[in-house]
A protein has these predicted regions:
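N-terminal leader/targeting segments and the immediate start of mature chains
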Residues: 2-91, 95-97, 264, 270-275
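Gly/Pro-enriched, hydrophobic low-complexity segments
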Residues: 197-273
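Solvent-exposed loop/turn segments connecting transmembrane beta-strands
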Residues: 80-85, 109-112, 248-251
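Beta-turn initiation residues at beta-strand->coil junctions
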Residues: 76-79, 102-106, 134-137, 243-248
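Solvent-exposed helix/loop surface patches that form functional interfaces
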Residues: 149-203, 271
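Structured extracytoplasmic
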Residues: 35-39, 45-51, 129, 143, ...
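An acidic-aromatic
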Residues: 96-175
């Protein structure tokens, strides 16, 4: 959003993509973040282990499946500290690397009534370069992508990404889809691990820790050298959830994918001229 040109550019060495995601989280994340989103596990007594060849293949395929499902409905929840939580509900198109949705900030506001706990809300758009915020048009109850089309480029407050949990989550989210699978052998060699088998909304998913950060020593540090990124992948390589542990925060940033959103058409206005 911080730029108006093409946002797609492919990284020459795709094998480094997973390590780039880890860098976004600033590594060295707080202890206990993963435990906050363990959920229901079918294998509570089974120890974690390195991924098998089949599991690495599914994990490697998950990014392509996400790309092919575009546009996809997403929900991002980020804890900013001090009891403040930001929730973004939107749609991501991995073919254009653009996304649009609504955001809501909650916390202790001191207010009463229907708006108790709500600190802010509005529309949000983001791409690989940054994000933009705008107020919801008065009296417009359409979907966020429809509302955003009627707000000119000049109506958006745009900025580049920072290192706060929301921005890190948006950056992670916009980069998850890809037009080809990753290298499963590289994922396995880089320390991806099977953690458990969980159920989400009645469906089974394998929970994986992503590859280790570059230079991390297995078993070292409070997190055992494990990646701050955790993925929930089904038997067909479909990605359902990703969590990202952040430094100093006990609750990880969470991204939920709920499938193809066939009704959505991402607007051109936020990325258009200055009208």
């Amino acid at each position: 959003m911080a730029r108006t040109g093409k946002t797609g550019g492919r990284t020459p060495r795709r094998a480094l993509w997973w390590r780039t995601l880890i860098a976004i989280t600033a590594c060295g994340a707080a202890v206990g973040g993963l435990a906050a989103y363990r959920g229901y596990s079918d294998d509570s007594t089974t120890a974690e282990r390195p991924v098998t060849t089949e599991e690495a293949s599914r994990l490697a395929l998950s990014r392509l499946n996400l790309y092919q499902a575009s546009p996809v409905a997403v929900t991002l929840t980020a804890t900013e500290g001090g009891g403040v939580v930001v929730r973004v509900e939107g749609v991501v198109d991995y073919r254009t690397h653009r996304a649009v949705g609504s955001y809501r900030v909650t916390g202790s506001s001191g207010a009463s009534g229907p708006d108790a706990g709500q600190l802010d809300h509005g529309l949000i758009v983001w791409d690989t370069g940054g994000l933009g915020l705008a107020p919801v048009p008065e009296g417009d109850d359409k979907q966020p992508w429809q509302q955003a089309e009627h707000i000119p480029r000049s109506g958006w407050s745009s900025r580049s990404y920072t290192t706060d949990p929301l921005d890190a989550g948006l950056q992670l989210l916009i980069g998850l889809g890809a037009d080809r699978p990753d290298n499963p052998m590289l994922l396995a060699q880089s320390g991806a691990r099977w953690l458990a088998h969980d159920r989400i909304d009645g469906r089974g998913y394998d929970r994986f820790a992503g590859p280790r950060a570059q230079g991390a020593t297995p078993g070292a540090g409070s997190d055992g050298g494990r990646s701050p990124l955790t993925y929930w992948v089904d038997g067909d390589g479909g990605l359902r959830r990703v969590t990202m542990r952040m430094p100093g925060l006990g609750t990880p940033t969470t991204v939920e994918f709920t499938g193809h959103e066939g009704r959505a058409k991402l607007p051109e206005a936020p990325w258009g001229g200055t009208g």
